[in-house]
Amino acid sequence: MAESQAKSPGGCGSHESGGDQSPRSLHVREQDRFLPIANISRIMKRGLPANGKIAKDAKEIVQECVSEFISFVTSEASDKCQREKRKTINGDDLLWAMATLGFEDYMEPLKVYLMRYREMEGDTKGSAKGGDPNAKKDGQSSQNGQFSQLAHQGPYGNSQAQQHMMVPMPGTD
């Protein structure tokens, strides 16, 4: 595990080349490479019954996988931004990276989520203004019914309501 931590792909550069090999990235501390275990644990517990338990190794595995996934997608988006000579990765770049990396099945829910997030944050520079064919003049999606609870949950969901947006896994019905 220590060997993989030293080779963090968390910077500029391709995920295939091992990421940023600048001197600053060679000595990445574990707490800088991974999301906090308490946050991972809290999110995992939301999917369990009240008396459910999660083993420490399960939390650590999910922590590493989630962190690697974020680096993977971000690296692809970063490569696109570098090719386009831009310094800031935006939500549209992340959606593009997700599609490029084979996560097309998640695109529609993520587009709706990003649109709702931008509405709530008052972002007028987002894709809804840029001509999203699914966005209406008032910024509402044609899929309004299925994802209507997103507008009331805030950008990261409402832990009080315990509502979840279910995204079908590829190959399941």
Swiss-Prot record:
InterPro entries found in the cross-reference section: CBFA_NFYB_domain (IPR003958), Histone-fold (IPR009072), Transc_fact_NFYB/HAP3 (IPR027113), Transcrpt_fac_NFYB/HAP3_CS (IPR003956)
PTM sites of type N-acetylalanine: 2
Region Subunit association domain (SAD), residue ranges: 62-73
CDD domains: HFD_NFYB
Entry's localization field: Nucleus
Molecular function as annotated in GO: DNA-binding transcription activator activity, RNA polymerase II-specific; DNA-binding transcription factor activity; protein heterodimerization activity; sequence-specific DNA binding
Pfam families in UniProt: CBFD_NFYB_HMF (PF00808)
Disordered, as annotated region: 1-30, 123-173
One GO cellular component term noted in the UniProt record for this chain: CCAAT-binding factor complex
Keywords: Acetylation, Activator, DNA-binding, Nucleus, Transcription, Transcription regulation
Tissue specificity of this protein: Expressed in flowers and mature rosettes.
Primary location recorded for the protein, binned into one broad class: nucleus
Chain intervals with Polar residues compositional bias: 140-163
PROSITE patterns referenced in this protein's UniProt entry, alphabetically: NFYB_HAP3
Domain of life: Eukaryota
Residue ranges the UniProt entry marks as DNA-binding: 35-41
Biological role stated in the UniProt entry: Component of the NF-Y/HAP transcription factor complex. The NF-Y complex stimulates the transcription of various genes by recognizing and binding to a CCAAT motif in promoters.
Subunit structure as annotated in this protein's UniProt entry: Heterotrimeric transcription factor composed of three components, NF-YA, NF-YB and NF-YC. NF-YB and NF-YC must interact and dimerize for NF-YA association and DNA binding.
Family stated for the protein in its record: Belongs to the NFYB/HAP3 subunit family.
Name of the protein in its database record: Nuclear transcription factor Y subunit B-8
Gene name as annotated: NFYB8
